[in-house]
Design a protein with these regions (language model features):
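A detector for small-residue-rich transmembrane helices and their helix-helix packing motifs
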Residues: 1-203
Length: 203
């Protein structure tokens, strides 16, 4: 019998395809720079800001490394979560985490005054998936890439989240939107507990 967790379910598959197509468009087509310009998420008072960017920015990536690691994590954790949550609930969860990530990043902009922010990438949504995996499978072991050691999912989520918060708070993370990563995790955690309260899921 085939193990469904080894297969790629429809929402994850379509998200992978759309992200790949958009990345090729921004990298290869003459209008690629304009897609990035108008699709990225900006501070709300920036003349380039539009509400649709809370969704469009999730499908844009800065470079190959950026999209590779995001899509690898989407494939790795998304397969399991879509089978468990169902395609509809998984899709809702993904976009809530992604949009929530953008909201928290813009909220920090209002405090730091860095109004030139241009946010791209599915990292916030993917961090929400990582959080969900850690909540639903706390004792499942994840094999790290560097160093190649196994660690329980719950500890990996806690450590990763703490590092992201520290880097965001200290400003040591360069151009990486660490508070967007934290935002994706927080919105994901809130949604999971809301669903549990409504008896939609159990953990």
């Amino acid at each position: 019998m085939n193990n469904p967790y080894l297969q790629t379910p429809p929402v994850v598959k379509n998200l992978l395809i759309i992200n790949a197509l958009v990345f090729m468009a921004t990298s290869l087509l003459p209008v690629g720079n304009r897609i990035l310009l108008y699709g990225a998420l900006y501070w709300v008072q920036n003349p380039l800001f539009h509400a649709y960017q809370f969704v469009s920015y999730l499908f844009l990536h800065a470079n190959f490394e950026h999209i590779f690691f995001n899509m690898f994590a989407l494939w790795m954790f998304g397969r399991v979560l879509e089978w468990e949550l169902g395609s509809r609930r998984f899709l809702i969860y993904y976009f809530v985490c992604g949009i929530g990530a953008g909201l928290l990043q813009l909220a920090t902009v209002s405090l730091t005054g860095e109004y030139y922010v241009q946010l791209v990438g599915a990292s916030g949504a993917v961090m929400g998936l990582l959080l969900a995996f850690g909540v639903l499978h706390p004792n499942e072991r994840i094999l790290l890439l560097i160093p190649p050691i196994p660690i329980k999912a719950k500890w990996f989520v806690i450590i990763y989240g703490a590092v992201e918060l520290l880097l965001g708070w200290t400003g040591m993370g360069g151009n990486i939107a660490h508070f967007a990563h934290v935002g994706g995790m927080l919105w994901g955690l809130g949604l999971l507990y809301w669903w549990r309260h409504k008896h939609k899921i159990r953990f």
